[in-house]
Amino acid sequence: VLYDIHGNKADVQEDIAAATLAAVRCPIASQPLQKVVRKGDKVAVIVSDVTRLVRTAEFLPVIISEINAAGVPDEDITIIVATGTHRAHTHDEDIAVCGKDIVKRIKIHQHDSRNNEELTDLGVTSFGTPILIDSYVAEADKVIITGAVSLHPMAGFGGGRKAVMPGVSGHATIMHNHAIALAPKVGDGCNPLCETGLLEGNPLHEDMVEV
């Protein structure tokens, strides 16, 4: 054994719903969710697809309830499954991710990165990446991102902006962004700035943020 690595201890959240409610009512550096959305808004809620281990079904009902409490009815809410380049969910997978009650109540849209008719062109990043975003997201008045923060071998960390890029981005956007993980010179392997746990100076991460 070369190293014995110990992480910082953290309290285990036994009640995910209660923790979620506390977070959306008293968030860090933001207004409470009920003050962010308002009656008349079209709200898009992005959720991770079935390939990601996220306990969405335990916290999503709380988020939907808070949106409702702000005056936004179910019919003005769309859940976007952030498939990236993955396939669409089956109905059973939607239930596994979102929960049976939410699937019955709320419209669920499966992102398709290759369907250009469902993408909105928002320009180009400073890295030259075309910004093609799912139109349900681009045209929403408010967008709520959910997901898990985790280590990522190219982007530094997963979560946050990755729900949008690659989650609900076009295929061309994803391919151009991910190519940044390769060294600028052909044959030199991977870009040394794109590595696990590194955000500052990581061009792949910075491009994602621009998207």
Question: Can you name each region flagged by the protein language model?
Answer:
Residues 42-53, 78-84:
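Short glycine-rich or small-residue beta-strand-to-loop segments that form or flank ligand, phosphate
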Residues 164-211:
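Extended, low-polarity segments enriched in aliphatic/aromatic residues
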Residues 2-4, 55, 145-146, 152-155, ...:
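Short helix/loop capping segments that flank catalytic or ligand/cofactor-binding pockets
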Residues 69-88:
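Auxiliary alpha/beta "docking" domains used to position bulky ligands
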